[in-house]
A protein has these predicted regions:
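Extended, subdomain-level signal for the structured scaffold at the beginning of enzyme domains
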Residues: 1-65, 77-89, 97-147
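Short, thiol/selenol-centered motifs that function as redox-active sites or metal-ligating centers
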Residues: 72-74
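Active-site-adjacent substrate-recognition loops and nearby beta-strands
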Residues: 93
Length: 147
């Protein structure tokens, strides 16, 4: 089951029940050569996924291959744990900003609807930036999105 976050009133965010998904993926079975890019979502899961050694290895493999990587909201917590942000500009949910700085990256505060691109990396601070991060990720992938 997923959780969704929203910005309401004076709270930093509120959490609501999201969607039910059957999880069938196995991190140990991931071959990064089979993927053109990596998109790390936010929410609460990055706090726990960054403790999984294979998740860290996957991120490091994508960066070593200079493949496109996107991370939104709390997603950059995984990037900081993977030690791949040195010298990179990135944004995130504001509470993750100090983690980016401590990992040697440059935290860039932007509006929640914006994204920051630095080389193969695109980041956004929260779900209002879904359009911006997706647009930039598609560009990094070398794809076109037409309606």
């Amino acid at each position: 089951r997923t959780a969704t976050h929203d910005f309401e009133g004076e709270q930093t965010y509120s959490e609501k029940r999201g969607h039910n998904f059957a999880l069938t993926a196995d991190f140990d079975a991931v071959n990064t050569a089979d993927y053109a890019g990596l998109f790390i979502t936010g929410g609460r899961s990055p706090e726990y996924l960054r403790l999984t050694p294979r998740v860290i290895e996957i991120v490091q493999e994508f960066f070593a291959a200079n493949k496109p990587v996107a991370a939104i909201c709390h997603g950059p917590q995984i990037l900081t744990a993977a030690n791949v942000l040195k010298g990179k500009k990135a944004t995130a949910y504001p509470a993750v900003g100090p983690d980016i700085t401590l990992a040697g990256g440059e935290y860039v505060a932007v509006d929640a609807s914006e994204a920051v691109v630095d080389g193969n990396l695109v980041t956004a601070p929260a779900w209002p930036g879904d359009s911006a991060i997706t647009r930039e990720f598609i560009k990094l992938m070398g794809a076109k999105w037409e309606l």
